[in-house]
Amino acid sequence: MTAEPARAISVMNPWAWRIVAGLQVVVERTWKPSWRGVLWIHAGKDSDLSAPAELWPPAGRLVTSAIIGHVTLADVQGQPGAWRWVLTDPRQLAEPVTGVRGHPGLWLIDLPPGLSA
């Protein structure tokens, strides 16, 4: 039996950090994925500098261009153009996988040996 490929999504900080910390359990997107399951969170190289200071991670915790954890994409609710992705089971990696280039949409990722959901 072949394992299903791992899927990831690139998200700007502080939102990526908030997702894997379990502080953001719903995210809004303009598109609806047909897939559900474990979703690896990639902290993109860019950050949302308009986000209020209280939403940012503690000093020293901000990581960019890295896989920082995973969640389960459990449900998608809404209507065309305004989809709410319901995220459960957040897990933050003790050591982020750095140097990972992000991509738009959901993308397949080759996880390093020994790393699994």
Which stretches of residues belong to each language-model region?
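Structured alpha/beta reader/binder surfaces that contact nucleic acids or chromatin modification marks
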Residues: M1-A117
